[in-house]
């Protein structure tokens, strides 16, 4: 059996431990066949990293395979000293951003080899749980399993975006509203409402704000979702910093027909707003998402029209 776990819209992990032998004699030759089949069906060249775990396979792809003529690289535990420990600067390593890199540099850590040989107890003391992961990853150890990740216990509807240039906080909020507009429409098309919202604002130099909150009443209206997101973002985000990534996801769905009576909610206004939103949804389904837009999407900060017609960030 082959088990897959999607990492992004154009990357995924595959565990073929128990199945590659059905198609080829080695994992490497299996990957060659897979690449050929993908190209024949899509005319797209792909890159493959093979590893003893998810971490090593990802690093093999990012650091070596993308620069190989055959676009395949294989990293095993025995390759850790020669391939992993020479990686520098540190932010090239999966899971280390520039902010963490600066903290590590202050401790005399400039390569993954330095990190691997830095006392474990100090990493744990200074970085907590992340310090434990840094120690394990520097030795090529990744305890996560695709089989564990594959189970979907709480479905969600999400949208994320990597910004094309640095955004101020106020401009980033414009894009966040566009993302919320998208996920709210998708919830309405499923005839559902969402109760829990998770959002993130990622800083240019690494790090950022992540927040999850639960609404008193489930909703599928972007103005109600945005009200909660803006409230928490204004409290948590560093206004003077620049931003490069944004995301929002909705979970804990309930059918539209299930609604508890709330004396503090204007039921007439809520139904009126939902009816208007659904009318716009129908227009966008019929004529395309660009047919109706909010004024913010026409500002310099808006990205909606730039994203129309893109797949995985590429023009189709």
Please place each PLM-identified region on the residue numbering.
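Short, hydrophobic beta-strand segments
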Residues: 12-18, 210-215, 260-266
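Short Gly/Ser/Thr- and Asp/Glu-enriched loop/turn motifs at secondary-structure junctions
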Residues: 7-11, 51-54, 192-196, 241-245
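DNA-contacting surface of Y-family translesion DNA polymerases
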Residues: 92, 102-243
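Single conserved hydrophobic/aromatic residue that forms the stacking wall/gate
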Residues: 1-3, 288
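Acidic, metal-coordinating catalytic segment for phosphate/diphosphate chemistry
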Residues: 218-316
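Nucleic-acid-contacting surfaces of polymerase cores and analogous helical-repeat interfaces
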Residues: 4-166, 282, 295-316
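Stable alpha-helical structural segments in soluble proteins, enriched in small hydrophobic residues
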Residues: 54-67, 138, 179, 183, ...
């Amino acid at each position: 059996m082959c088990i897959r776990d999607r990492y992004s819209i154009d990357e995924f992990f595959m565990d073929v431990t128990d199945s590659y032998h059905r198609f080829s004699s080695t994992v490497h030759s299996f990957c060659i066949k897979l690449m050929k089949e993908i190209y024949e069906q899509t005319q797209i060249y792909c890159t493959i990293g093979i590893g003893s775990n998810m971490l090593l396979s990802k690093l093999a792809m990012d650091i070596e395979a993308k620069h190989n003529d055959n676009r395949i690289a294989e990293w095993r535990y025995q390759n850790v000293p020669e391939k992993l420990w020479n990686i520098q600067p540190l932010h090239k390593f999966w899971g280390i951003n520039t902010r963490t890199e600066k903290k590590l540099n202050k401790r005399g850590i400039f390569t993954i080899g330095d990190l691997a040989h830095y006392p474990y107890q100090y990493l744990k003391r200074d970085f907590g749980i992340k310090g434990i992961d840094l120690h394990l990853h520097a030795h090529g150890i990744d305890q996560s399993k695709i089989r564990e990740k594959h189970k979907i216990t709480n479905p969600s509807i999400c949208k994320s975006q990597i910004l094309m240039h640095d955004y101020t906080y106020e401009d980033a909020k414009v894009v966040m509203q566009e993302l919320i507009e998208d996920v709210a429409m998708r919830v309405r098309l499923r005839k559902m409402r969402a109760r829990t919202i998770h959002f993130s604002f990622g800083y240019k130099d690494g790090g950022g704000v992540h927040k999850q909150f639960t609404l008193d009443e489930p909703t599928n209206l972007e103005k109600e979702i945005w009200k909660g997101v803006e409230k928490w973002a204004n409290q948590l985000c560093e206004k003077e910093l620049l931003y490069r990534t944004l995301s929002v996801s909705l979970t804990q769905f309930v059918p539209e027909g299930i609604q508890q009576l709330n004396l503090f909610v204007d039921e007439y206004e809520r139904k009126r707003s939902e009816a208007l939103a659904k009318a716009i949804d129908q227009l966008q389904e019929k004529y395309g998402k660009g047919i109706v837009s909010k004024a913010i999407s026409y500002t310099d900060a808006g990205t909606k029209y730039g994203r129309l017609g893109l797949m995985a960030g590429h023009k189709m």
